[in-house]
Amino acid sequence: MSSLDNDKTENFIQERLDSLHEIDCKVVTLLDQFSSIFQSFYTKSKEDFSQQTSDIYSTLSKVAIDLRKEIKIMDDNIGAYDKNDDNVMILPISNVDQKNTKLGRKRLDLELAELKRLISDEKQVETLENESNNEIQPKTESDTNQVETNENGNDINNKESEDIEMKE
């Protein structure tokens, strides 16, 4: 391979590296913007907050577009050497789509167990709150209008009904 071919290869690769470096810098800027918006949320005016939010969305959009472009360039150059000026071919890798599913499944199971525990704790708290609300209820106007009765259906507060029961 001649030095001219080596320079061409380095050009394509260097362009990809430079492009990824720019994307990385934009991601760092995005993180910095997030940090500043959280720090200044309570202290600055609404105009500043909306401007910072707009800047975040703008940077995020630029990062997404640049990443899509790089992915397209990589996809176009897989298995084809004539897609770029430097005749660089990216070899296909068949194992790229495989993920560590065991670790992901274990993490998912742990998260689901934690959620179930939290939900059951919430339900217990709700039932305790409902029970405590049922035990102590302030009298309402409708409660004061109700007449208390004994097992015979007679008014407890009415003395005449007691006298009738005693005579029987």
From Swiss-Prot:
Chain residue ranges for the region called Disordered: 126-168
GO BP annotations listed: regulation of transcription by RNA polymerase II
InterPro entries: Mediator_Med11
GO CC annotations on file: mediator complex
Biased composition (Basic and acidic residues): 157-168
Primary location recorded for the protein, binned into one broad class: nucleus
UniProt-recorded Gene Ontology molecular function terms: transcription coregulator activity
Biased composition (Polar residues): 130-156
Quaternary state and interactors: Component of the Mediator complex.
Function comment: Component of the Mediator complex, a coactivator involved in the regulated transcription of nearly all RNA polymerase II-dependent genes. Mediator functions as a bridge to convey information from gene-specific regulatory proteins to the basal RNA polymerase II transcription machinery. Mediator is recruited to promoters by direct interactions with regulatory proteins and serves as a scaffold for the assembly of a functional pre-initiation complex with RNA polymerase II and the general transcription factors.
Name this polypeptide is given: Mediator of RNA polymerase II transcription subunit 11
UniProt gene name: MED11
